[in-house]
Amino acid sequence: MFFISANLFSQSNFEKGEKLFAQKKYNEAKIHFDNYLSQFPLNLKTIEYLGDIAGHNKDWDEAIKYYEKIKQQNPQNANYHYKYGGALGMKAKESNKFAALGMIDDVEDAFLIATKLDKKHIESRWALVIFYIEIPAIIGGSETKAQVYANELMQLSKVDGYLAKGYIDVYFKRYKNAEINYKNAHTIGNSKTTFEKLYDLYLNKLKEKAKANKLKELFEK
């Protein structure tokens, strides 16, 4: 009887944690996940949730700790490597340049492993596009490499492919090329994301307010 009660209590902790997490009540969810993990210390989903909560709270060291644990327990899971690389990348961004340099290779490796483990993993390919564009060429940044993963995204999702190419064009101030890519993405996707990218380009980069207003009017119909 006690075993059944304890099991129901622990299950209740996990379900409550999931519900609170879905409601974005992360700190409350953490209490329930911590309780559940104390009884089931190898439950990967719980550890992943705790990593996600740490990430939402920008506690990168804590997020890295959790994601490293789950990727070691299940090294074939692409998403675990992607999340580990993402948390490590955010820590690198907020660290001094010397400390960040020591993390760059591990960030890149984590994203690359994710792409190799899952040929359809969109998030890790997006991460590599941004990674290769944002880091200096002297430590591995490369538009050519970024375009490789933008092309892979194009094969998986036309919207993501055009958005990735538009992102690269905006970074290098090729705004007319970016307009073509963002328009293609918006024509296919017609989503809040595609609208916002094209609207921002018109308003803040091309300084074409009339186009921005027309786009907004059509999107909000």
State where each predicted segment sits.
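Structural marker of alpha-solenoid helical repeat scaffolds
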Residues: Q39-F40, Q73, L117, L153-L156, ...
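Residue-level recognition of tetratricopeptide repeat
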Residues: N43, N77, H121, K158-D160, ...
